[in-house]
Curated annotation (Swiss-Prot):
Similarity comment: Belongs to the SfsA family.
Taxonomic lineage of the native organism: Bacteria, Bacillati, Cyanobacteriota, Cyanophyceae, Synechococcales
Organism: Prochlorococcus marinus (strain MIT 9211)
Listed transmembrane segments: none
Gene3D superfamilies according to UniProt: 2.40.50.580, 3.40.1350.60
Name listed for the protein in its UniProt record: Sugar fermentation stimulation protein homolog
CDD domains the UniProt entry points to: SfsA-like_bacterial
GO molecular function: DNA binding
InterPro entries linked to this entry: SfsA, SfsA_C, SfsA_N
Gene: sfsA
Length: 256
């Protein structure tokens, strides 16, 4: 299944990133010479992929319900091996492509048959949190527990090592604790969605958020499962690039 196309779309427009500002906005000079303002769904630091002057891909999708007609979808980076890689930066996509991967059978070996998938289901101690995906096993699945699946868009790398998070994330810390809470009556599955196809391994971003790293290791010891998965980003489609192994700690290095 490696290289299987999961999502196709109209060819994206390419250009140069001029700047990102006010967290949600990015000015892009298209290859046509026109300058447009695109919506940036990723409000974090985008460590290693936010590079003014770098090439980007944007989507034109005008709608009466949207203030901006353009969306920033991908960024091109040069990795430590000197290769140019396209990285998915639209944080609205990971939930969609992970669900598509499950439906395509990419997780079947790890999860067994899945009968039902629900999005954004309320859970947690207060009932105010929402799990990204709630999976119901098929009747032939040997483990009939529901699967609470939390997805994390992962774009930061150190060489071939993918890292999440790239900044302090109290929300991410809370999610780990809530995943521990659903055990043992259900399965809890953390899926780092690695939105680039040039990595071999995943680890928690201890340098960016040591509390998250500690909670990650606690979650592992309590029984939370971790399944990093990798995707390839192209101008008109996204591909499944397989699972990746993980390690429990990051070699500490300073953030750029």
């Amino acid at each position: 299944m490696i290289g299987k196309s999961l999502l196709t779309f109209s060819t994206l427009n390419e250009g140069i990133l001029l700047k990102r500002y006010k967290r949600f906005l990015a000015d892009v000079e298209l290859d046509t010479g026109h300058i447009v303002t695109a919506h940036c769904a990723n409000t974090g630091p985008m460590t290693g992929v936010l590079k003014p002057g770098g090439r980007v891909r944007v989507r034109y999708a005008p709608s009466p319900s949207r203030k901006l007609s353009w969306s920033w979808e991908q960024a091109q980076v040069v990795n430590q091996a000197g290769n140019r890689i396209w990285v998915g930066v639209n944080t609205a996509l990971p939930n969609k492509i992970v669900r598509l991967a499950i439906e395509a059978g990419c997780f079947r070996e790890a999860l067994g048959e899945i009968a039902r998938i629900r999005n954004e289901v309320k859970y947690g101690r207060t009932g105010n949190s929402r799990i990204d995906l709630l999976l119901t096993p098929g009747e032939n699945n040997c483990d009939q527990r529901q699967i609470f699946l939390e997805i994390k868009n992962t774009t930061w790398t150190d060489g071939s090592l993918a890292l999440f998070p790239d900044t302090v994330t109290e929300r991410g810390q809370k999610h780990l604790q809530e995943m521990i809470d659903v055990l043992p009556n259900a399965r809890a599955l953390l899926v780092p969605c690695i939105s680039r196809n040039d990595v071999d391994l995943f680890a928690p971003g201890d340098a960016a958020d040591p509390i998250y790293g500690n909670l990650f290791r606690q979650a592992l010891s309590e029984g939370v499962e971790v399944m990093p998965c990798c995707f390839g980003f192209f101008s008109d489609h996204i591909t499944w690039e397989g699972m990746r192994p993980f390690r429990e700690t990051q070699t500490i290095f300073p953030l750029p």
